[in-house]
């Protein structure tokens, strides 16, 4: 019995020794499996480092670890629902804008498109830190974890924040708690237009932004570099085909509503329309149409078909031009400068047609008056007997002697030849030779052409002179107005 117990104790001891020899090898195998290439191991500093540590400098690894701890500490207990300085001071947000592209501008929708880098700077005491770097560049991921201004664009119809290939946002944190937040935006903003001077018009397209929820007692806005340098437009930033960007004016406004007073930052971009397109498409065709309508004054007044074609064609052409010129404009209730020009041109063209109608009317009346004499003369011819001879003699015979006579000069003989009746007396004073015949003026139904109408003669001078005077006054007025507007913008 004792021997059996000793043998069992001996076997248990051998088994224990065997297990002691096996376990260290097993532990080494497990650790070797964990340290495969590409795996990470814990370091004493508490960070993560690759197995191939010489590839990454130790100081860089230390900075990453340090700032990771700093950010974790800053965000620990940070409430992004509360603005900086809540209950103590007003939060000041400084802004500036860099315009990368401006345009296009839509006249029909009265809006414009602008692509900008929008920058905002503010101070947050909760984000102060001490570290090896004074400025910490960050990406957009931290922006969702901290408080940011609730800026919106008052006259923006649609705004797009670019997200390709990642959200185009930049966040920089300074050790004193100052933050710089930059984003790239494409904004479709409203631009009220007054088109009375179209197409020599100038517009001030505003860009207005401010806080949506915070009043002036909580958040105020200011320009980072002052009013002169806080808004900058790139040299090649204009995307305008019909406008020139003259400049911009920066300002600040206070608006009042039922919820309080709000600060609104404003920038007005001044645009001047290019007139070249409209000169080619509208003004020159109108001028040429008016000149063409005045060509009819130099045609014969009996050329009814030609002058009718001139008048009707030019009127229809002006109607077509006026309709096409309005297609590129919004349907405003007032007349523009182009409308006035086309209305005057239309009046000249229509007046030329009326002038022809007047001349043609009086021309037909004169033919009718001449035609009245023909039936009366034919009636007289039937009642008065005439000598059946075809030739009228230009001589007369007195006592056997023949003398030549000029009936056109001698009025007495002309009266005798026209008014004397055949006498039955046996002793006539004047004995006509066999060649003598009775002279009778009988009108014929022949159409005679009228001379140039006095109305046409006057119109050839009056119409061109009046049209030239109108053009001088029209262009002088709007060119001077354009210079005054440009001078006003430079002063601002």
Swiss-Prot record:
Phosphothreonine modifications at: 427
Protein name, per record: Gamma-aminobutyric acid receptor subunit alpha-3
Residues recorded as bearing Phosphoserine in the entry: 426, 433
GO cellular component, one term: chloride channel complex
Cytoplasmic compartment segments: 296-305, 358-457
Residues in compartment: Extracellular: 29-274, 326-336, 479-492
Its job: Alpha subunit of the heteropentameric ligand-gated chloride channel gated by gamma-aminobutyric acid (GABA), a major inhibitory neurotransmitter in the brain. GABA-gated chloride channels, also named GABA(A) receptors (GABAAR), consist of five subunits arranged around a central pore and contain GABA active binding site(s) located at the alpha and beta subunit interface(s). When activated by GABA, GABAARs selectively allow the flow of chloride anions across the cell membrane down their electrochemical gradient.
Domain of life: Eukaryota
UniProt subcellular location: Postsynaptic cell membrane; Cell membrane
Pfam family, one: Neur_chan_memb
């Amino acid at each position: 019995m004792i021997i059996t117990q000793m043998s069992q104790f001996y076997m248990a001891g051998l088994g224990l020794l065997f297990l002691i020899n096996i376990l260290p090898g097993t532990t080494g195998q497990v650790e070797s499996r964990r340290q495969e290439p590409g795996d990470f191991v814990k370091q004493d500093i508490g960070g993560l480092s690759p197995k191939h540590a010489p590839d990454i400098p130790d100081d860089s690894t230390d900075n990453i670890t340090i700032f990771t701890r700093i950010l974790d500490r800053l965000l620990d207990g940070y409430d992004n629902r509360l603005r900086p300085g809540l209950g103590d001071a007003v939060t000041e947000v400084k802004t500036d804008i860099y315009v990368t592209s401006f345009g296009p501008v839509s006249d029909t929708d009265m809006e414009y498109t602008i692509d900008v880098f929008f920058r905002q700077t503010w101070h947050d005491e909760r984000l102060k830190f001490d570290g090896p770097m004074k400025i910490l560049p960050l990406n957009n991921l931290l922006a969702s974890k901290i408080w940011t201004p609730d800026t919106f664009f008052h006259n923006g119809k649609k705004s797009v924040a670019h997200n390709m290939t990642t959200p185009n946002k930049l966040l920089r944190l300074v050790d004193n708690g100052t933050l710089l937040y930059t984003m790239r935006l494409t904004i479709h903003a409203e631009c009220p237009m007054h088109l009375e001077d179209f197409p020599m018009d100038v517009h001030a397209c505003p860009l207005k932004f401010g806080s949506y929820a915070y009043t002036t007692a909580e958040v105020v806005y200011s320009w980072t570099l002052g009013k002169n340098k806080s808004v900058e437009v790139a040299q090649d930033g204009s995307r305008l085909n019909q406008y020139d960007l003259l400049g911009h004016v920066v300002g600040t406004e206070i608006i009042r509503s039922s919820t309080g007073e709000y600060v609104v930052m404003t920038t007005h971009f001044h645009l001047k329309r290019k007139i070249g397109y409209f000169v080619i498409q509208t003004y020159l065709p109108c001028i040429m149409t008016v000149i063409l309508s005045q060509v009819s004054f130099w045609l014969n007044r009996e050329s009814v078909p030609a002058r009718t074609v001139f008048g009707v064609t030019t009127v229809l052409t002006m109607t077509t031009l006026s309709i096409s010129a309005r297609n590129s404009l919004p349907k405003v209730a007032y007349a523009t400068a182009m409308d006035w020009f086309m209305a005057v041109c239309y009046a000249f063209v229509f007046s030329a047609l009326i002038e022809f109608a007047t001349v043609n009317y009086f021309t037909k009346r004169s033919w009718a008056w001449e035609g009245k004499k023909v039936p009366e003369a034919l009636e007289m011819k039937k009642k008065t007997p005439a000598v059946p001879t075809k030739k009228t003699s230009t001589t007369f015979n007195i006592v056997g002697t023949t003398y030549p006579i000029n009936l056109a000069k001698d009025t007495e003989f002309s009266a005798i030849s026209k008014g004397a009746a055949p006498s039955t007396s046996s002793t006539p004073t004047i004995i006509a030779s066999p060649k003598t015949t009775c002279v009778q003026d009988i009108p014929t139904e022949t159409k005679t052409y009228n001379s140039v109408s006095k109305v046409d003669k006057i119109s050839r001078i009056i119409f061109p002179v009046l049209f030239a005077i109108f053009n001088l006054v029209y262009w002088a007025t709007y060119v001077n107005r354009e210079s005054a507007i440009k001078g006003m913008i430079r002063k601002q």
